[in-house]
């Protein structure tokens, strides 16, 4: 599809474009092509593949938006809420399963759990809860089994203990993506709830990206908490 996102626009600039763009403008063309993509490509994909699903995992990278702004986090939140509208949630009886499939187990997962130390995982999961529940969205999932967790499907770092000035603290060791160097660093604290918008005017988060480590032949792929995800989704079916 021949369209592309308009990045780095503020909310006011976006609204101005929607109000003032002429029918033959680039903005109007992009909007038309995007709507065609939604109605004819995405909708058809959902109808053909997702209508029979009864278990769902929703993944979200809560760390990367923190490196940018509250608006970046809000954009991801809005995208998720739009996604929810395409699925049916609720308890299922036998007839429902046959004629009207619904999601009856739903897990919300914060990714990149290996990019922070283990003591920060509760805060990362808390951000995931805020992402989903803010604005009362949790009401839609009141009748189904839900859970929140944080994982790394491929673990890229190792947690180590560093002694400095007579004090010990947890740190991460891994290959940093930006320079491909092996580093040992403290990644920083994850807020339990999203700071207000003016927080980013004075300071910012800097969560580094890490490369998956090279595996020896026959070595298992390291992960964080993938076993818990499989147990939640499939445990009652085994």
Give the residues covered by each predicted segment.
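Acidic, Ser/Thr-rich peripheral helices and adjacent loops at domain boundaries
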Residues: 78-81, 126-133, 160-190
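Short conserved micro-motifs at the rims of enzyme active sites and ligand-binding pockets
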Residues: 69, 119-121, 159-163
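GTPase G-domain guanine-specificity segment
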Residues: 115-140
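Conserved P-loop NTPase catalytic core
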Residues: 134-136, 144-147, 154, 174-175
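Short, conserved secondary-structure transition motifs
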Residues: 104, 109-116, 148-160
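Short glycine-/polar-rich loops that comprise or flank the Walker A/P-loop
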Residues: 54, 102-105, 143-146
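Switch- and interface-adjacent substructures of P-loop NTPase systems
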Residues: 1-102, 117, 135-136, 152-156, ...
């Amino acid at each position: 599809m021949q369209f592309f996102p308009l990045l780095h626009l503020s909310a006011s600039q976006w609204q101005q474009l929607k109000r003032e763009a002429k029918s033959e403008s680039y903005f109007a063309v992009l909007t038309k092509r995007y709507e065609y993509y939604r109605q004819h490509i995405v909708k058809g994909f959902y109808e053909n593949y997702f209508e029979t699903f009864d278990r769902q995992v929703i993944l979200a990278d809560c760390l990367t938006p923190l490196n940018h702004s509250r608006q970046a986090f809000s954009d991801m939140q809005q995208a998720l809420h739009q996604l929810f509208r395409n699925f049916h949630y609720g308890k299922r009886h036998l007839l429902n399963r046959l004629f009207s499939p619904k999601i009856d187990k739903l897990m919300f997962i914060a990714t990149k759990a290996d990019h922070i130390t283990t003591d920060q995982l509760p805060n990362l999961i808390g951000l995931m809860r805020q992402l989903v529940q803010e604005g009362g969205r949790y009401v839609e999932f009141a009748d189904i089994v839900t859970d929140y967790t944080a994982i790394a499907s491929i673990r890229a770092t190792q947690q180590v203990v560093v002694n400095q000035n007579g004090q010990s603290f947890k740190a991460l060791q891994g290959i940093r993506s930006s320079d491909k160097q092996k580093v040992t660093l403290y990644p920083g604290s994850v807020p339990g709830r999203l700071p207000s918008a003016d927080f980013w005017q004075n300071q910012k988060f800097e969560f580094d990206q890490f490369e998956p480590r090279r595996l020896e032949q026959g070595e298992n792929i390291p992960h964080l908490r993938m076993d818990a995800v499989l147990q939640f989704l499939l445990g009652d079916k085994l």
